[in-house]
Amino acid sequence: MAIERTLSIIKPDAVAKNVIGQIYARFEAAGLKVVAAKMAHLSKGEAEAFYAVHKERPFFKDLVSFMISGPVMIQALEGEGAILKNRDLMGATDPKKAAAGTIRADFADSIDANAVHGSDAVETAQAEIAFFFPGMNIYSR
């Protein structure tokens, strides 16, 4: 497998539960390295721009409202097969369908408040990382 980078967001519900460290421990145990990170409280404009791909979907307004409801922890992860590895760690979008031991099964409350976001492909990972970490704010280790 190739070394990849992926974007991960720990959403407001998980930040409020104070489980950032537990989620980071799972990244590291899976061989993923945090190569950039920041905490932010997204503006409505930032959330709308980031999730623009979903603009015509019925859940868009609720998604934006949720993502601006509190601070988020945003990180770029790096490692072999990072995109799929992170998606496996996250579990299914709906925590009721997520496998036991996944981040969403353990920390998410609902399909809306589902604890984490992760890039779904190489192209989206590149765009999402560039959105939050433009330029030289990423440090391979």
Curated annotation (Swiss-Prot):
Which cofactors go with this protein?
Answer: Mg(2+)
- Give one Pfam family, short name only: NDK
Q: What is its EC number?
A: 2.7.4.6
Enzymatic reactions:
a 2'-deoxyribonucleoside 5'-diphosphate + ATP = a 2'-deoxyribonucleoside 5'-triphosphate + ADP; a ribonucleoside 5'-diphosphate + ATP = a ribonucleoside 5'-triphosphate + ADP
Q: How does it assemble?
A: Homotetramer.
Instruction: Quote the function comment for this protein.
Output: Major role in the synthesis of nucleoside triphosphates other than ATP. The ATP gamma phosphate is transferred to the NDP beta phosphate via a ping-pong mechanism, using a phosphorylated active-site intermediate.
Compartments, record wording: Cytoplasm
GO terms for cellular component: cytoplasm
Binding residues for ATP: 11, 59, 87, 93, 104, 114
Q: Which HAMAP family match?
A: NDP_kinase (MF_00451)
* Organism per entry: Polaromonas sp. (strain JS666 / ATCC BAA-500)
What name is this protein filed under? Nucleoside diphosphate kinase
Keywords, A to Z, come to: ATP-binding, Cytoplasm, Kinase, Magnesium, Metal-binding, Nucleotide metabolism, Nucleotide-binding, Phosphoprotein, Transferase
Q: Please name the top-level EC class of this enzyme.
A: transferase
GO MF terms held by the record: ATP binding; metal ion binding; nucleoside diphosphate kinase activity
What InterPro entries does its record include?
Answer: NDK-like_dom, NDK-like_dom_sf, Nucleoside_diP_kinase, Nucleoside_diP_kinase_AS
State the Gene Ontology BP annotations.
CTP biosynthetic process; GTP biosynthetic process; UTP biosynthetic process
Q: Does the keyword Magnesium apply?
A: yes
Q: Highest taxon of the source?
A: Bacteria
